[in-house]
């Protein structure tokens, strides 16, 4: 149904929840009309995936509605589970009645074919006799509740709806159905009593087992036995895993995008702990009971429950390494490792920190309990993490792309990277034993270094001696065969710390190129001289111009450029470092974590309006939800609303259509917000001068 086809009652059915909605409650920016409730529930960043899943289910379900047999007696079950003798007892008259289509049903089937673009070159009887199941809703089984609690948080639109008899036998090439959406009765082959292994299909000759478009590994040719790697619980578990991973990626996205502003408002003990732990990422972890199950911790954050002032440490773990499969808690990844190790899905784990071990230094074999590094007192920020327990960061060159890079990449590039990574690790994930790729550590003589003071996901360095050419990068942002973006004189590349270099020892550095929109306000080194470091000077430019200054020996020029039209707002920071004395000497000291200020916004000064630059009261102003730097006073917001016209869509007062996070849809003011802003001048007390 298109946007213009609205019923006479001015109500439109949502494609997902199928409830009648008024036009103002519908959103037409996606491939199907959906209501605002479904978009808010699923999230704008994954609503297309839910729509595509629902489209696949509706495709298969439309055949059942248009070609399913009429009501049967209460004693009849699903026809594809009937005894062969009962199947043989069907007379020609019964067959004709079962497959009879009246005018209304034909029209419904035709509309379904037209809507979903399926061909009608199918024989009249080439479909499965799928009767309505006596219990369950339209053949959809009840979702399983046997999995761990963390894997059961699902939306009603993305549950494992793999009921029997939903997808008929099709001509090959007509419909490409993912294996996790194919009913189990069709994947398992025919019942044992069927002669010749032919399925229950009334038609012109036996149907081949490949008529579903199922991959050869999922369908058995001539063997009626059930595939050993496929079961209904496996399918439900796979759907739950996809849902859990999507939720974890959403949490990661929210954590990285709001990191700078949120960390600025947290207590000093929380900020110090987060900065210290972030400087040690990524590092490897393994399961205590099976050392072949490896993952890596790549991000930390602090979360607090609503209404409470206490913060709790939150960590993000990728398991298996290089799979881009994210877990947002230690207990979650420990449960998954335990399931992969013991194949026991009923037992739960008390604490993931007791079952995970981390390697203090890569290749040293010094594995320690993660609970010793992060005891309860550290996880609740009562004590600082022990410096002697901190691991050294290590990025495996065999899988250099961290999941946090997916947050920063464009959507098409991120999807391609996730697809290639999942394809490469699919064999390991399905075998039950997940191992990390083995690859040699790069030679320390290659001029590569590890910058420990920057957050995860942005450790992309390119090393070159002074006067030489920057080292080439074989993968931009960790994506194979992608050209590096033109961000500066060097190509961004994630590197690993040299094995021979001490943790905080000297190491050569040439350029830091890319800081993506994970930070609204990037970390900038403080001025000063510490541990033989050259003084670091930071020059901040406005959003519309870039300041530059000549690079002199023993100095660092920082340039910050804020781009308000790069996705949902981004900040780029480029540091150009000149070696001391102008000679290619490898003895330049590394930027240490202690040079990073306690708060990334400590020196940002008072809040000011983006338009008039007047000082803002800290609780009464308009904040753009997409671009952190877009802050507006009420008079400027009122003028912008009047200029745009309060009767239509009113976008960001900056004059730009700032998109929502994870979407291309621009945000707009609600009518209540417009009324509040236009109500009159709000007299508030402004912040005093310090």
UniProtKB/Swiss-Prot annotation:
It holds the Pfam family zf-C3HC4_IRF-2BP1_2. GO terms for biological process: regulation of transcription by RNA polymerase II. Keywords: Coiled coil, Metal-binding, Nucleus, Zinc, Zinc-finger. Residues 234-245 have a biased composition (Basic and acidic residues). Residues 59-87, 134-251, 419-599 are annotated as: Disordered. The keyword Zinc-finger applies. Residues 207-222, 557-567 have a biased composition (Polar residues). One of its GO terms (cellular component) is nucleus. Residues 231-263 form a coiled coil. The keyword Flavoprotein does not apply. It is found in: Nucleus. A zinc finger (RING-type) spans 609-656. Residues 419-431, 464-480, 538-556 have a biased composition (Low complexity). InterPro entries: I2BP1/2_C3HC4-RING_sf, Interferon_reg_fac2-bd1_2_Znf. Its main location: nucleus. GO terms for molecular function: transcription corepressor activity; zinc ion binding. Signal peptide: none annotated. Belongs to the IRF2BP family. This is Interferon regulatory factor 2-binding protein-like A. It comes from Xenopus laevis. The gene is irf2bpl-a.
């Amino acid at each position: 149904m298109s946007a213009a086809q609205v019923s006479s009652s001015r109500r439109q059915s949502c494609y997902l929840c199928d409830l009648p909605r008024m036009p103002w409650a519908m959103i037409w920016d996606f491939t199907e009309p959906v209501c605002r409730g479904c978009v808010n529930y699923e999230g704008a960043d994954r609503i297309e995936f839910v729509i595509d899943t629902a489209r696949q289910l509706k495709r298969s379900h439309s055949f059942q509605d248009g070609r399913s047999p009429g009501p049967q007696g209460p004693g009849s079950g699903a026809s594809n589970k009937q005894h062969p003798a009962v199947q043989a007892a069907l007379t020609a008259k019964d067959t004709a009645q079962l497959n009879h289509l009246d005018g209304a049903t034909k029209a419904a089937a035709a509309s379904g074919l037209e809507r979903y673009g399926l061909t009608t070159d199918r024989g009249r009887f080439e479909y499965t006799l799928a009767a309505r199941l006596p219990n369950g809703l339209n053949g959809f089984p009840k979702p399983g509740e046997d999995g761990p609690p963390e894997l059961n948080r699902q939306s009603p639109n993305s549950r494992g709806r793999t009921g029997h008899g939903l997808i008929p036998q099709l001509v090959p090439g007509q419909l490409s159905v993912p294996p996790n959406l194919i009913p189990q009765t069709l994947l398992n082959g025919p019942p044992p009593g069927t002669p010749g292994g032919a399925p229950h299909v009334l038609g012109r000759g036996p149907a081949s087992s490949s008529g579903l478009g199922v991959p050869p590994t999922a369908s058995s040719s001539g063997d009626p036995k059930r595939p050993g790697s496929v079961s209904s619980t496996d399918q439900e578990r796979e759907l739950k895993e996809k849902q859990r991973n999507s939720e974890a990626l959403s949490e990661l996205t929210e954590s990285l995008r709001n990191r700078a502003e949120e960390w600025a408002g947290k207590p000093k003990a929380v900020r110090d702990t987060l900065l210290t732990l972030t400087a040690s990422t990524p590092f490897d972890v393994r399961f205590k009971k099976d050392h072949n199950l490896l993952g890596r911790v790549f991000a930390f954050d602090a979360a607090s429950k609503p209404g409470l002032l206490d913060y709790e440490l939150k960590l993000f773990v990728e398991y298996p390494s290089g799979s881009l499969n994210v877990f947002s808690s230690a207990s979650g990844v420990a449960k998954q490792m335990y399931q992969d190790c013991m194949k026991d899905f009923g037992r739960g784990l008390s604490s993931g920190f007791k079952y995970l071990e981390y390697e203090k230094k890569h290749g040293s074999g010094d594995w320690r309990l993660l609970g010793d590094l992060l005891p309860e007192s550290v996880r609740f920020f009562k004590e600082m993490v022990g410096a002697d327990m901190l691991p050294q960061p290590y990025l495996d060159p065999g899988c250099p792309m961290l999941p946090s890079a997916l947050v920063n990449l464009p959507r098409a590039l991120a999807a391609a990277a996730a697809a290639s990574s999942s394809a490469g690790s699919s064999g390991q994930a399905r075998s039950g034993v997940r191992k990390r790729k083995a690859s040699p550590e790069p030679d320390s003589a290659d001029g590569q270094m590890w910058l420990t003071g920057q957050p995860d996901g942005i450790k992309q360095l390119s090393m070159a001696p002074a006067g030489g050419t920057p080292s080439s990068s074989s993968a931009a942002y960790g994506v194979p065969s992608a050209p590096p973006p033109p961000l500066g004189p060097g190509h961004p590349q994630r590197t690993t710390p040299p094995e021979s270099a001490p943790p905080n020892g000297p190491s050569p550095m040439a350029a830091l190129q890319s800081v993506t929109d994970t930070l609204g306000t990037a970390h900038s080194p403080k001025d000063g001289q510490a541990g033989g470091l050259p003084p670091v000077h930071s020059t901040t430019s406005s959003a519309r111009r870039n300041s530059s200054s000549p690079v002199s020996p023993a100095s660092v020029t920082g340039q910050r450029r804020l781009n308000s039209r790069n996705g949902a707002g981004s900040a780029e920071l480029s540091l150009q470092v000149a070696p001391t004395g102008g000679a290619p000497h490898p003895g330049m000291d590394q930027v240490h974590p202690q040079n990073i200020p306690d708060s990334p916004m400590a020196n940002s000064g008072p809040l000011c309006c983006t338009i008039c630059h007047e000082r803002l009261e800290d609780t009464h102003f308009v904040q753009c939800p997409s671009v952190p730097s877009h802050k507006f006073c009420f008079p400027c917001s009122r003028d912008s609303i009047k200029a745009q016209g309060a009767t239509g869509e009113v976008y960001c007062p900056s004059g730009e259509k700032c998109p929502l996070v994870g979407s291309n849809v621009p945000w707009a003011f609600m009518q209540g917000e417009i009324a509040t802003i236009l109500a009159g001048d709000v007299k508030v007390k402004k912040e005093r001068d310090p």
